[in-house]
Amino acid sequence: MNDSEEIFISRSELDTLELGRKFAKTLTPGVTVLLYGDLGTGKTVFVRGVGEAMKVAGVRSPSFTLVNEYESPTGVFLIHSDLYRLDEGGVEALGLEEFIGASDSVLFVEWPERWRNIPVDNVIKIFFTALSETEREIKIQEE
């Protein structure tokens, strides 16, 4: 991937969903998407939009399940993980490494700061910042 950065302003949850839908069209299996941002800034909403574009229903926050796997009709898996409640040892026990670069999945990780062995190849970083109660800045960095 080429290094690039795009900044979007979302004014509502619907805007964030739509941005996720559009972003999904740019994804290829094997990519890891790292989602940075405080609680409530739209990370899971964005992934739900990706899921909708992939024809995956019922994308929910993995805050308590830690990892959710969804299979699209095309056979590509959407893997969605939330590391918020884990320390480094707990993250390693999840086995996320098996999804890195996998030819049949895209991996989304919320709170990647908690992941010591964070991947560096084929990674997209997305930063969510609350500008107001409803407005979000969403910065997408491809490396």
Question: Model-found features: residue ranges?
Answer:
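P-loop (Walker A) phosphate-binding loop of NTP-binding proteins
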Residues: 38
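Short beta-strand-centered segment that lines the nucleotide-binding/catalytic pocket of NTP-utilizing
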Residues: 56-70
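Conserved lysine of the Walker
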Residues: 43
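Phosphate-binding P-loop
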Residues: 24-30
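Hydrophobic anchor at the beta1->P-loop junction of P-loop NTPases
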Residues: 33-35
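Short phosphate-coordinating micro-motif centered on Lys-Gly-acidic
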Residues: 6, 89-143
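N-terminal pre-Walker A segment at the start of P-loop NTPase domains
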Residues: 2-22
